[in-house]
Amino acid sequence: MIKEKLTIILLYITKFCMRFIYFFIKVFTKQKNKITLLSRQSDRLSIDYILLKKELEKIDGIEIKVMCKKIPSSFLGKVKYCFYLIKRMYHISTSKVCIVDGYNIEICVLKHKKNMKIIQIWHALGAIKKFGYQVIGKEEGSNKKIAQIMNMHANYDCITCASNATKEIFSEAFNTDKSKIQILGMPRLDYILGFGGEIDNKIKLLLDEYEFLKNKKTILYAPTFRKNTKMDLKELINSVDKEKYNLIIRLHPLDDSNVPEEFLIDNKYSTLDLIKFSDYVITDYSAIAFETAALNKQLYFFLYDWEQYVNTRGLNIDLFEVFKSSTTKNINEILKTIENNSYNYEELKKFREKYIETLDLNNTKRIINYVRECLEKNN
């Protein structure tokens, strides 16, 4: 209780200091014809940002600033990040459009210039598990008071998604009116569906580096991140017939569970690359299910902790209902379906048609067109 009170006091002080500094930054800076892309998901550009930046560079007369940096775990790292935030605040103040792919404190708690537009493209194509305002007060969710202090997911002018079904979910998760959510899609869809041939080149490099992958079909296991829980991978590893299948394990970046080296692929190959390459994808509550469905790959859900996860987090999609034949608590049932080649593609098709309406290779283009509209209104 004391720790929570101290945290709340510290957050109020942080918020006040940021607003105080930002007030003077706004006073002494002018907006430029600038677009700033912000992220704290990673220290490097996501494929969504790479594709957006590439298209934005084709627009004459605009400046593009990209700032991607995770919040460090160390105390000294956090102190340095505070100074880095001031730099981000400057670029926000001098921009006409800001694009984000997750919660960013400087976007949500500050009061921005009226004509500056903020576009949230989120870092997931859809949401099987609940998040944001859907899980406030739950074990895996945010503290209600802290979410209120930090203005969680405030100030967005537009939130992009890939379907009407996802629009309903995002409206709850971001606590916003559906009119602010637009079905523009996500750039990553253009990438995995082969626009420009970039992913095919990546797969070729993968096979050149890991030649043993050429000889057998590949099973990819990519679960979601679980707070305060290390994954036990022994059952999965022992159950897969290594004589017949390659097994690749790709954990969430925040998951530090131990994975034997033989099942790992270098992180220069993204999870999207691995989905594209693999023949079968096993996940649980991860949003990679949507990319897998977009590629019409065999998709399986290994839900060994179903009851616990529903209670601590909650789900937007009842997987046992939607994927009756490929959702199970028993890994051997999945492997049996793979072995018998008896996958139900009709269930996958219904899921894809409901949750992904933007399979036309124009996702990046639609978002860029929206950015253009924002710039034109500001000129």
Predicted segment positions?
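Membrane-proximal basic amphipathic "stem/tether" segments
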Residues: 1-42, 79-83
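Active-site and donor-binding regions of nucleotide-sugar-utilizing enzymes
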Residues: 34-196
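Helix N-cap/beta->alpha junction signal
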Residues: 102, 162-165, 253, 285, ...
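Catalytic binding pocket for nucleotide-activated donors in carbohydrate/polymer assembly enzymes
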Residues: 255, 260-261, 287-355
